[in-house]
Amino acid sequence: MTLKSFDIVIVGAGPAGGHCARILAKSGRQVLLAEQNDTFDKNDFSSAATPIETLSKFDLPESAIGSYWHKLTIETSKVSQSWESPKSLGVVLNFAKFRAFLASEVKGNGSEVWLGYRYIKHSQANGETIVEFKQLSDGKIIQVSTKVLVDATGFARAIMYEKENDKPDFLSGTGIEYLIEVESEVYDKYANDLIFFLGDKWMPKGYSWIFPMEQNRLKVGAGRIFLDPKTVKNLEPLKKYIYLLIDEYLKSKSYKIIDKHGSTLKYSQGLKDIYCQDNIIAIGDTVSTVNFLGGEGIRHGMDGAEIAGKYIQQYLDGKISNFRDYETEMHRKFDKKWHISERLAVRKYIDDVDDVLTDKTIDYLKYMKTEDVMDILFEYKFEKISRGLGGYLIRKIQGFIQKFGG
């Protein structure tokens, strides 16, 4: 029997998988993008906030946008600080529509998208890679052949690690998010504001958030980082902190829950993931492109997908025989900032007793320009924190004078 043949099979239609398939399909390659969920509305698991530059960089349409925001707020147990801009600072993507758009681009450029197909296994035969899927609607097993196989299965890492026992220890995190419909007056108050909550009052050993979506809808979520077994003990369920935000912060009296979803993060400390093996290449969360400090992954997964796409093209053209240069370039791009983020995550989520570090950080940031705060939070330019020390030191000196100057 002759199997259907592709240049590239990509398993997982998240941001990295969808964007990689989109790039390769546009270049004329025959791509199969396979996703185990039968609709993009299932497990709509990303909070999906991103800076405004993401739209132009990745050519994303208005239809993928849930809302724009021009204000950024950080709430701690004791402190509230906001930064604003007269123009939009970023968007919250409609994650389902965003992924559906990427898939439509794949199909529009002559390639295929299969929804409701679960990856089972792969094998080598006659110089080709045979990939086996199970069609979830009827249980039918389908095989295809490919020249390159891409693992975009996220934290599952289903292709790179055949058995669960083969996986190394990962740092892990988990988050849940409610999409709620609120009264117009509540929505209007927070419609343009990206709000993060830090500190033991709002979310011990993690953070929570309120993001605007379409009219009268807000995303309310909470995430927790497990850096060591001590973290897990004596912690309340995440949903407790979501209801805390709804009841105490939003004070919505007649909200309606539209959707609940959640996800897990498995992050390789030191970026020691398997990036490639023979003609198999891994992208997105499969190689920890999500930033561990804040859990943001969409932009970084798409960045990595573009790097992978470049090397896949070279491989198919016979210019390279393996993907080692891909691994090298990924480390060059991510290592430094990700390592700093790891260390900050440990300090914030494990070592920050009574929110001392959190409050001190906000004390630094409050004197900074909005664009500098955006650079720190979204571009990880941590060196800019020093720019806030001027105002911080001035305030400390003034306090000293008041205390001892009579």
What is the meaning of each model-derived region?
Residues Q36-I74:
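N-terminal FAD cofactor-binding segment of flavoenzymes
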